[in-house]
């Protein structure tokens, strides 16, 4: 079986602060917990919460657990650290040869 390759390439990384631009959680901000490459989705902290009913097991109690559900990357944008608004990402080569991600709005470097 051939491996499914995503149609979307993402410049988002774990730990980036993003804002939701579409859907039921539009306007909410949070940090990326996980990037799901094959699904072209991200898990964002405290955004798109769902309830899961779990059975009791040896190491955990049963009950209703709230957890984050994936959001498609087309529905989130990175937050510009300089302005606090949603922005696109550009890539830039620095003098020392490193490739870094740059906020398109302000030109602020996103990589540390």
Swiss-Prot record:
Source organism of this protein record: Magnetococcus marinus (strain ATCC BAA-1437 / JCM 17883 / MC-1)
Gene3D superfamilies: 2.30.30.30
Regions that span the bilayer: none
A GO molecular-function descriptor: structural constituent of ribosome
Described purpose of this protein according to its UniProt entry: One of two assembly initiator proteins, it binds directly to the 5'-end of the 23S rRNA, where it nucleates assembly of the 50S subunit. One of the proteins that surrounds the polypeptide exit tunnel on the outside of the subunit.
The encoding gene: rplX
GO biological process, one term: translation
Superkingdom of the organism of origin: Bacteria
Protein name per the record: Large ribosomal subunit protein uL24
A Pfam family assignment: ribosomal_L24
Keywords: Ribonucleoprotein, Ribosomal protein, RNA-binding, rRNA-binding
């Amino acid at each position: 079986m051939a491996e499914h390759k995503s149609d979307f390439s993402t410049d988002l990384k774990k730990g980036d602060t993003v804002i939701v631009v579409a859907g039921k959680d539009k306007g909410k901000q949070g940090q990326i917990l996980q990037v799901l490459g094959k699904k072209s989705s991200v898990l964002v902290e405290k955004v798109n919460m769902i309830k899961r009913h779990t059975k009791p097991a040896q190491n955990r109690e049963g009950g209703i657990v709230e957890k984050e559900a994936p959001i498609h990357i087309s529905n989130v944008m990175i937050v510009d650290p300089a302005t606090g608004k949603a922005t696109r990402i550009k890539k830039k080569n620095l003098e020392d040869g490193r490739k870094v991600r740059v906020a398109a709005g302000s030109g602020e470097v996103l990589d540390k």
